[in-house]
Amino acid sequence: MEDIQKNHEAQRGLQNRHIQLIAIAGTIGTGLFLGAGKTIQMTGPSVIFAYILIGIAMFFFLRTIGEMLYNDPSQHSFLNFVTKYSGIRTGYFTQWSYWLVIVFVCISELTAIGTYIQFWLPHLPLWLIEIVMLALLFGLNTLNSRFFGETEFWFAMIKVAAILGMIVTAIILVASNFHYTTVLSGKTVNDTASLNNIFDGFQLFPHGAWNFVGALQMVMFAFTSMEFIGMTAAETVNPKKSLPKAINQIPVRILLFYVGALLAIMAIFNWHYIPADKSPFVIVFQLIGIKWAAALINFVVLTSAASALNSSLFSATRNMYSLAKQHDKGRLTAFTKLSKAGIPINALYMATALSLLAPVLTLIPQIKNAFNFAASCTTNLFLVVYFITLYTYWQYRKSDDYNPNGFLTPKPTIAVPFIAIIFAIVFASLFFNADTFYPALGAIVWTLIFGLYSHFKKI
């Protein structure tokens, strides 16, 4: 009987060390390596407060997910709880919306991977690179989830090594009172690595409070993959041990990897001169004589994008599997099929096939603008899903399943409203920026139209 059950459930192949590194990989995105200069220019040293504020909100948000998963780790996704506690129609809307978001992430990350590889192989067709990389990651995802965990483990280690290298470099330069002459933002700068670069003339909002809110947007969307750890519970060997540990270490990781890296950059360079359009990591490593710094950081962001695509394929596959088991059972039964390795194989085929839209976009650039707009709209759906998840958590607390002795969210009556307010501020601010207004409006239109469809659909 046990063997039969195993053949009908995704297999538990993820070890504790995999979960810890998956949590790190979900915390660190390409935005830190490529976009740190832009966020620093928007609000100066107070950018660290933006990361801390959003980091606190995301930590408590993950604690709400962790509390539900700890109580019932058999669920294949944290989204399953939406159906369980907020109703089947809300669950239908949320899971389909989240699946759509993840598919768009797959396409976007595959395109990014191709661009990064062309840094070294500029004459190789982008569409060919995309197909080869997708085939490789598809192959990895057909193996036992333990292999997925190993891949993410080493992807995360590369990112961690780059950040720690930056922090150690800053400590050495500051401690040695390192003086340098370099060109930043078109200006010749003579300066010394010092903490004074951060604290002298400090202003909380040097470019106004609105730019600080704009930085909150960028930080929020840099953190949107952190909930991925909630997709791994059903395939973790000992979720009641590993999940709490991984989630509780998130604040330390944010302080070390984000705040630590940003402080390191701003200690070396006066923030006024840090260019918004160039990676500060490249500038720092070039400063200490690493001539191939650009290639090094390109390798890091390549592994980061590959990690994001790998995780997104994993997530889209499990989400479709969960959808097929909970909703539309007649039409989606094929997606409940598991391979011998315990992988929802047909769901993986579907996610991979849709990811092939990336090389199609490369070959037919005329439709790329429409895709970019749709991708921007779906990115904002992350926040819609987060709001629904918060509501679901509150419904769980009122249900008979509530476990007062579990992995409890600290001060939930304070934490949940705080999270909701931060998320609401970020979402509302999207309507006051020309670049984000229409994508935010598109997310609302999707929510209204598909929400009504989900409400009236026979399920």
Swiss-Prot record:
GO terms for cellular component: plasma membrane. Its main location: membrane. Keywords: Amino-acid transport, Cell membrane, Membrane, Transmembrane, Transmembrane helix, Transport. Coiled coil: none annotated. It is a multi-pass membrane protein. Pfam families: AA_permease. The chain crosses the membrane at residues 19-39, 42-62, 97-117, 119-139, 153-173, 212-232, 254-274, 281-301, 341-361, 370-390, 412-432, 436-456. Disruption phenotype: Deletion mutant shows a significant growth defect in medium that contains only free amino acids as a source of amino acids. Mutant shows a strong decrease in L-serine uptake and cannot transport L-threonine. Can still transport L-alanine. SerP1/serP2 double mutant is completely devoid of uptake activity of either L-serine, L-threonine or L-alanine. GO terms for biological process: amino acid transport; transmembrane transport. It is found in: Cell membrane. Transports L-serine, L-threonine and L-cysteine with high affinity. Stereoselective, with a strong preference for L-serine. Is the main L-serine transporter and is responsible for optimal growth in media containing free amino acids as the sole source of amino acids. Is also the main transporter for L-threonine. Belongs to the amino acid-polyamine-organocation (APC) superfamily. Amino acid transporter (AAT) (TC 2.A.3.1) family. PANTHER family: GABA PERMEASE, TRANSPORT PROTEIN YIFK-RELATED. This is Serine permease SerP1. It comes from Lactococcus lactis subsp. cremoris (strain MG1363). The gene is serP1.
